[in-house]
Amino acid sequence: MHKYRTHNCNELQISDVETEVKLSGWVHRRRDHGNLVFIDLRDHYGITQIVFTDQNPQLMEDASRLRYESVITVRGTVVARSEDTINNTLPTGHVEVLAVEFSVESAADTLPFVINTEKDAPEESRFKHRFLDLRREKLHNNIILRSQIISHIRHLMTASGFTEFQTPILTASSPEGARDFLVPSRMHPGKFYALPQAPQQFKQLLMVSGFDRYFQIAPCFRDEDARADRSPGEFYQLDVEMSFVTQEDVFSTIEPVMYDLFTKFTDKKVSETPFVCIPYNESMLKYGSDKPDLRNPIIIADVTEIFRDSDFTIFRENIKKGSIVRAIPAPKAAALPRSFFDKMIEFAVSEGAGGLGYIQFSETGEAKGPVVKFLSPQQLESLKATASISNGDAVFFASDKKEKAAKLAGKVRIRLGEELDLLEKDCFKFCWITDFPFYELNEETGKIDFSHNPFSMPQGGIDALEQAKTTEELLELTAYQYDIVCNGIELSSGAIRNHKPEIMYKAFSIAGYSEEEVDKRFGGMIRAFKFGAPPHGGIAPGIDRIVMLLAEATNIREIIAFPLNQQAEDLLMNAPSYVEDKALKELSIMLSPSARKNAEKE
């Protein structure tokens, strides 16, 4: 007989009755019934009930003193449970093991929180004792699910002709839009490596190297603040790059992967392929967001022209100054109490708006509300037609400069979807957002900057760049840039790449970079492009966000084995931490006085 186990704790069935077995695991629960002691023994696979009887009083007494989460090995005989004690919620619920002997492999101290329930525990304690937290069923299953998803992704990608690569972790800084994690070089004092924000340049260089289809389950490092769907330090993505492809080729390659994943690991309805494509400008108009949740049926409409010549002075004057008006329908909300509309106004104000106009259209078509008296009957009918409003609906209005009005309307749309319970249930709705602006105005400097990935190919190529003379014309340029969105969550960005040096130099010069700066920052890739680069493109769906959706987790930390907390700390391993002066000297690093003071305190 094996030293620790002959079976796992999810394995024994009626067919095993009268078999002598050995099991090992953690004490999940213990129940003392006087002449009987029951222990639920748990391992990675499941739970088996162990019974100790008064036929062996010492063994039963020893079992009654076992602490929860102690690790034990039990030898005994499988017996059938009586009809009234069968537990149909367990795969092993028709049997139990009558213990003959047990040994304690490792006794547990007093637990900082309860393991055998999903009851919330303080997050700090959970992170400090993550090894205990990971024993809890839901979190344990999430980590298993993550492994299964990644394994299936590898299978799908390999079956589609992709080759898996590993790219460097120690590399140079790149302009991915976030702060780098820097690693000082001992051999080159004063110089630093950067942990990759993404393997962007390496995967493009692999295409230039003659490989055709690349993928990697890639670790990415960005010094960002934590969010519910974003880790503050490290995340993983399905990094993909392909040679000789158009935007549509990327779509037709990734869509089956997403569809297969989401249909395999959930019973919910999944968008059929091909996924709907929505141009960026249309998405901002209809949904007030570049990551729309298509489970929400509300579609925003532009009603600027209706208010341009209206008697509603506030909107009319705003329009004269360049503002717009967006209408956000609220289906079947006309009869709701005044408190609902007041709550929506409070929400808009909390989002920075001056207020939120609205109109209610009764079931008979009567219009009422603070805006009604400023509109003619013809304007009201035009409003209903333009915004697809029916009798019984209400409609809210957002007026501001184009970008602000669109974003406010989008937030109101989301809030209405929640308040009115409009979201379609039990489904995953995918879409592509395409034709992103190539440039944007930097809010801090007021200068032209790249909107997304600077390595994207501008639509129209170098001709489009050279023909755009004014700031307005530059801001109208679009890129072969695309996002894939599911239920309002951006799963990935991707692009057809700029593989021509002359276009890259021109694109960067418009954003204020000289050729020398481009060569300095991206010399390796520029050099490669001068020796025959294929047209190529790619995408990088976020593994963590995919797992979050499939696990129905509300926080990214619930699908990562050892995450950082919101302050980017690892409370289990005590990272980040101060290091000895000797190590700093080897790296030619000197702490600032304030940092030195903090180090001395520790």
UniProtKB/Swiss-Prot annotation:
Its EC number is 6.1.1.23. Gene3D superfamilies: Bira Bifunctional Protein, Domain 2 (3.30.930.10), GAD-like domain (3.30.1360.30), Nucleic acid-binding proteins (2.40.50.140). The record marks 33 as: Important for tRNA non-discrimination. GO terms for molecular function: aspartate-tRNA ligase activity; aspartate-tRNA(Asn) ligase activity; ATP binding; nucleic acid binding. InterPro entries: Aa-tRNA-synt_II (IPR004364), aa-tRNA-synth_II (IPR006195), aa-tRNA-synth_II/BPL/LPL (IPR045864), Asp-tRNA-ligase_1 (IPR004524), Asp-tRNA-ligase_1_N (IPR047089), Asp/Asn-tRNA-synth_IIb (IPR002312), AspRS_core (IPR047090), GAD-like_sf (IPR004115). Transmembrane segments: none annotated. One of its GO terms (biological process) is aspartyl-tRNA aminoacylation. Residues 200-203 are annotated as: Aspartate. It is found in: Cytoplasm. The keyword Chaperone does not apply. Its main location: cytoplasm. L-aspartate binds at residues 176, 222, 452, 497. Keywords: Aminoacyl-tRNA synthetase, ATP-binding, Cytoplasm, Ligase, Nucleotide-binding, Protein biosynthesis. PANTHER family: ASPARTATE--TRNA LIGASE, MITOCHONDRIAL, ASPARTYL/LYSYL-TRNA SYNTHETASE. Aspartyl-tRNA synthetase with relaxed tRNA specificity since it is able to aspartylate not only its cognate tRNA(Asp) but also tRNA(Asn). Reaction proceeds in two steps: L-aspartate is first activated by ATP to form Asp-AMP and then transferred to the acceptor end of tRNA(Asp/Asn). This is Aspartate--tRNA(Asp/Asn) ligase. It comes from Rickettsia africae (strain ESF-5). The lineage of its organism: Bacteria, Pseudomonadati, Pseudomonadota, Alphaproteobacteria, Rickettsiales.
